[in-house]
Amino acid sequence: MVSQDFSREKRLLTPRHFKAVFDSPTGKVPGKNLLILARENGLDHPRLGLVIGKKSVKLAVQRNRLKRLMRDSFRLNQQLLAGLDIVIVARKGLGEIENPELHQHFGKLWKRLARSRPTPAVTANSAGVDSQDA
């Protein structure tokens, strides 16, 4: 079972990590006032990076609240997202949304991201072989 912490190893820390996700995302999930970009990372756990600029959310209090909610939602749903580097980009108007609505919205976005992942080729091939033999 994946631990539900948000330790240093589960964060995107360097500009190189962010650039890799921005340059070649394997998954994009647009949402209400935000965009989630994802890329396979080859690890057994997901990593999260947040981009919340002053232009999109003016007040520091609101930016900090959003970051806290995003991290918490990621922490609770990370078993769905194993092996992904994820960047959340905030857009204008995100700061005005209330906490319960944001939690619900993030839950839906994580599920959409998990569904949009490409299935591993090994699993697809082995399933095809089994069905042909039967």
Curated annotation (Swiss-Prot):
This is Ribonuclease P protein component. Pfam families: Ribonuclease_P. The gene is rnpA. Its EC number is 3.1.26.5. Consists of a catalytic RNA component (M1 or rnpB) and a protein subunit. Keywords: Endonuclease, Hydrolase, Nuclease, RNA-binding, tRNA processing. GO terms for biological process: tRNA 5'-leader removal. InterPro entries: Ribosomal_Su5_D2-typ_SF, Ribsml_uS5_D2-typ_fold_subgr, RNase_P, RNase_P_CS. Belongs to the RnpA family. It is an enzyme of class 3 (hydrolase). GO terms for cellular component: ribonuclease P complex. RNaseP catalyzes the removal of the 5'-leader sequence from pre-tRNA to produce the mature 5'-terminus. It can also cleave other RNA substrates such as 4.5S RNA. The protein component plays an auxiliary but essential role in vivo by binding to the 5'-leader sequence and broadening the substrate specificity of the ribozyme. It comes from the Bacteria. GO terms for molecular function: 3'-tRNA processing endoribonuclease activity; ribonuclease P activity; tRNA binding. It catalyses: Endonucleolytic cleavage of RNA, removing 5'-extranucleotides from tRNA precursor.
